[in-house]
Amino acid sequence: MADSDDEYDRKRRDKFRGERSDSYRTERRDDRRPVGGSAGARDEWAERNPFRGGASAGGGGARHRPDYSDYRGPGARPRYGSPGRDLPPAKRMRPDWGDADLRPNPRFGGYDPYLMQAWNDHYQSMHSAYSHAGHAPPVRESIGGGGDTLTQPAMLNLKQFLDTQDENISDSEVMRKYTEYKTDFKRQQLNEFFVAHKDEEWFKNKYHPEDSVKRSDEQRGFLQRRTDVFVELLENGTIGSVKVDSSQGDALIRVLDTCVIKLEGGTDEDLKVLDEKPKDPVVCERKAEPIESAKAVEKTINSPKEEKISEGDPLPAIVSPQRKTVKSVNSDEENWDDEDAENATPKKELGEDSKGTDSKPEDKQLNKKKTKKRKRNSTDDDSSSSESSSSSDEEKLKEKYDVEDGLRAEQKADAEKDRHEATKAKQEPESPKLQELEGKEIVEPKELDSKSNTAENDDTLKSPEISPTPIKGTDNGDDNKVEEDEKKPSVDEIKVVETETIDLDKVKNGQPRALHRTSSIFLRNLAPSITRAEIETVCNRFTGYLRVAIADPLVERRWYRRGWITFMRDVNIKEICWGLNNHRLRDCEMGAIVNRDLSRRVRPANGITAHKQVVRSDIKLCAKIALNLDERFRLWAEVPTDDSHPSRADESTENGSGSTYGFNSKNPVLQNITDYLIEEASAEEEELLGLTGENKDTDGEPIERDEQLISVLDRLVLYLRIVHSVDYYNHCEYPYEDEMPNRCGIIHARGPAPVRVTNNDVQEYIKTYESKLQQFLTKTVLLSDEEIKDLGAKDPETEVEKFVQANTQELAKDKWLCPLSGKKFKGPEFIRKHIFNKHEEKVDEVRKEVQYFNNYLRDPKRPQLPEHPGTSKRTESESARGGGGGYRPPMYPPFSAMPYGFGPPMMGGGRGGRNFPPARRELPLEHQRRLIGYHDLDAPANSDMFD
């Protein structure tokens, strides 16, 4: 019964096979063994030994029992296949770098070369060090060929390095050579890292002579724009009217939103949107006017062309044929069936209203088929539902388009107002144009029909590519006029577009825009090779794309990055997210998910920050940070200097002409700041009255607030937050905030103050907080030329000479070849002249490459792989185990071949082909220790003795 084919086909035993113990399997298999138990054991050893098959199966181990598919024959692929022989399923192609447990790298089989101390890899590594059945141990991948790993390769310690040297070498010579080895090892790691990442965009933006300058100019432009907005708000009293207290959260959010609207190019008219509250009457309008609500629902699903037409004219005849095309490209039919069922009744009414329009009979037939199909779905749903199905449908509709997206109701209400105003305003001025167009329609019906056919075909073909136009059209109506001239649509489309241009101008002049609200998508997985331009090309196909932000790569994520894509608020962000998930860049799943809105924008800090002594200390720290950041980016400098490297500004301020506050800076928040940094105390009075600080230390003193000091501090805190994106009370910086969905999203403010506070608590808080802000207080100083020489800096002229020599080839006597052009010359000096005259751009590329590499070395915070834990933490006993030898193989797999030809592999089994350990070398005197003899008194007489 257990061996029947039906039992195998049901695959119920597959998922429990790995959970049964060895004893259970042994008992079940005893009756099937031959009489000669040894022969059966040998036959089944390959299936029962967990260490067999590790090398052939990629380190994953073989099955403990025969596969059911072997008995079953060809059929469906088993669900629980071997990881070494079967490809992983499609949804498991995401890399494992995001996991915190540091799972082994699949490149290296079942173990990772730099995580060999892990318990899961111990048995595999110990097994793979031995050879089985004449097969050599598996060869490890070289460090430079297979890409980056989590750490650098392990460096030899002194004892391992001694085994590579001659036995007669002196101690001083050993130490000198070992120092050279460590220096060369570091140089090689820096060079390998540079070669591996020099073609990636994030690396070029940091160190490339041209790209880094462009990036720094772009960031300086962002900072200058933020500075202008802050000064404007400071002058009109917006900054001075708010305090950075958690109790004034609404006022702080209003200030941040005002900054965002100004940064987006908004006007004072757009700031009125901050006074408007979310509209509740939208639900009532939806119940009273089902047609309008259906249009609002369709607006979020339709293509950009439909969106543009529905805003100008409520005629649905032009909308219906395009909706099918866009859904087939950007959406999935299975995911939108529910919405079709919900919208069946309103769309039927729309179809009846559109009978009087100029739509084609083919389009009408398509609409009828759609409505019949939706009717069928809706009747099936109604037959199985209760009497309250209509109300539940409305609740689903509200939850999907109002509750989930939160603020979309406000945008819809604004669109309804705009539509009503547009219909009132367009009637009188549009009448002569409409008459002329109608006359043209009567005179030339054939030409218009042909143009309408071509326009519809163009729309169906180009529907995913014209998506950005409606959103940008809300800011400028001229873009829509250009579309009219290019596409030449039919009469009805011309009416719609013309009325839309007029309406958009009125909306721009009279209706405030909520520029501070956006929708965004988070990309969890971006390969280092993916560029910003590639992401922008993909996103430009969707409606309302604004910008993209890409984070810096992290070593623990295997240099993969994260990204945020920002769209306008009124787009269907879920449909866009679905389209991005169906798109792959460079064979990489981006992992797009919808980014939620910020939950708490104002977050409380420690209430002790309101104490007068702490406030004065915070003013001092804020002034230092502001001065340091202003000098780094030269925001308030009189004459900006041109530098070849973006970080060169740090060197110009190293000797610092602005070390005092307010004197050498034109920053308005730093003017007269020294008046508030001088501490005052009634020390004489306390001494005469016998008042000491003992009572304050034991019982504490109440929180003392100085409103004047607090107002000065608030200006500094808001300046750092708005201009430099530094959240002072969270002691952190929000990087690349100008490209993020929320340009001024979160701020930390002073929380509720405690009743009493002791002097020790105040001093401890001040000391701790200053240590947390050291990253902003210290100036970044680039390494000097002498320091980067030790790291392997290159000379431009030397590298150019190497380039010339590499492109000078001698073919025969007095016959030389230049590989760059293929021309032949009589001597090398002619090739040299030829290269400098005809290939000057390639010589310049060599010089730029040298400067590129030196810029990387000059950065003290340069990215690089972390050191191997064995380099610094491995004890001598662990190192000695890997010394090699023929008697016992090493406990761990061998590393890659050692750089610079230093004799044997790092932890290999002896030198070359020898099968015995190398001669033991003596350590220098400072590393030697006295050997202690040992003799076992209970051992027999012929045993070994160690004296």
Swiss-Prot record:
One of its GO terms (biological process) is regulatory ncRNA-mediated post-transcriptional gene silencing. Disulfide bonds: none annotated. It comes from the Eukaryota. Transmembrane segments: none annotated. Belongs to the ARS2 family. PANTHER family: ARSENITE-RESISTANCE PROTEIN 2, SERRATE RNA EFFECTOR MOLECULE HOMOLOG. This is Serrate RNA effector molecule homolog. The gene is Ars2.
